[in-house]
Amino acid sequence: MWLFTVNQVLRKMQRRHSSNTDNIPPERNRSQALSSEASVDEGGVFESLKAEAASPPALFSGLSGSLPTSSFPSSLVLGSSAGGGDVFIQMPASREEGGGRGEGGAYHHRQPHHHFHHGGHRGGSLLQHVGGDHRGHSEEGGDEQPGTPAPALSELKAVICWLQKGLPFILILLAKLCFQHKLGIAVCIGMASTFAYANSTLREQVSLKEKRSVLVILWILAFLAGNTLYVLYTFSSQQLYNSLIFLKPNLETLDFFDLLWIVGIADFVLKYITIALKCLIVALPKIILAVKSKGKFYLVIEELSQLFRSLVPIQLWYKYIMGDDSSNSYFLGGVLIVLYSLCKSFDICGRVGGVRKALKLLCTSQNYGVRATGQQCTEAGDICAICQAEFREPLILLCQHVFCEECLCLWLDRERTCPLSRSVAVDTLRCWKDGATSAHFQVY
């Protein structure tokens, strides 16, 4: 009888255990089996024994003398998933947890601290998960690092900061220099304004061709001559005109600002002379010099002027480099003079080449096209596209466009393409054939 009862109890225990493990889905095999087993009371595994057998001593009274009594550790729970190959162990709870549960009267689930897995795929996925988390944290840490500014930007900020701090002192220094040389600055501004006015007026008269005004040309000549004579007379004690003929002006010392003063006055005077010579060319009537040929003379005058302007400062720079003080180093002065001479020789060679090309162009005739027939003029509308008047000595270009000869020559003195089709009509662009004068300040 008692064997039958024990057999029933063991079968119930097996059915309870199999129901707890077989009902778990495959993807929730181990963790939920652990939670279901852990949610049972520590002594609840044997509650079925207590329910059916109210008094264990009565059931096993016949074997009390032959079977030793042993206490089952209520806190030890063994479990295994059905067919999963995983074994998990719940370690005994501490005394504090047991006491707390007893006092509270309710069981609070606590996650197990240690899990032992048997299966290569679970270990591999866990390592991959940990490695991925580690890489993710490292990438987030790299993204959070503040970017450093570029070196060029930091240097620019430093320069701007320095300028903000030093700008007041720079302005004070400039104000002091301007006050010391106020007379020279005023004279240079006046001469520059005179040059700009005369140059623009002359170009306007050149573009008018035969309709130019002789009175305006005479006014330009008188205006330039008056300014030149006034400046030279005002500073006659310095004998600034000597620099125009490669002589030394009358100055006790020659510092850097004195050098700029003498070179600047000489350069402006030579520009005035250049404009005056071009005014004489403009004033010549058509009988003496044709309008289409005047551009060549403008070019020759300008190239000769630039060559002469580049030669004037040489003796002044030699004087400034060597100096009047005997304590100066002759070796350093000699080296600087050699370097200056080399640089200046390249500049002069370029100027000489420009003069040679201008003279060659002056001696050769330039044909931009051939004479147009009456039929070609009729097909073109009998109106010049440049002057908007009837054709006078019409020329036809390779692009089959017809223009007046004078209009075409004046146009090609500034441009190198056809006014209508923009096809190339001349090989090279020739500057200074429109009567303009270079505003370049020849300081060296």
Swiss-Prot record:
UniProtKB keywords: Membrane, Metal-binding, Transmembrane, Transmembrane helix, Ubl conjugation pathway, Zinc, Zinc-finger
InterPro entries reported for this sequence? RNFT1/2, Znf_RING, Znf_RING/FYVE/PHD, Znf_RING_CS
User: Zinc fingers (RING-type): which spans?
Assistant: 384-422
Q: Which domain of life is it from?
A: Eukaryota
Localization annotation: Membrane
Spell out the SUPFAM superfamilies in the cross-references: RING/U-box
Q: Where is the composition biased (Basic residues)?
A: 107-121
This entry carries the following GO cellular component terms, namely: membrane
Please give the residue ranges the record annotates as the region Disordered: 13-41, 92-149
One GO biological process term: positive regulation of ERAD pathway
List all membrane-crossing ranges.
182-202, 215-235, 256-276, 330-350
Bias kind Basic and acidic residues: ranges: 131-140
Entry membrane topology = Multi-pass membrane protein
Give the Gene3D superfamilies listed for this entry.
Answer: Zinc/RING finger domain, C3HC4 (zinc finger)
Instruction: Identify the residue ranges that face the Extracellular compartment according to the record.
Output: 1-181, 236-255, 351-444
Provide Cytoplasmic-side residue ranges.
Answer: 203-214, 277-329
Q: Which PANTHER family match?
A: RING FINGER AND TRANSMEMBRANE DOMAIN-CONTAINING PROTEIN 2, UNCHARACTERIZED RING FINGER-CONTAINING PROTEIN
Q: What does this protein do?
A: E3 ubiquitin-protein ligase that negatively regulates IL3-dependent cellular responses through IL3RA ubiquitination and degradation by the proteasome, having an anti-inflammatory effect.
Please identify the protein, giving its name as recorded.
RING finger and transmembrane domain-containing protein 2
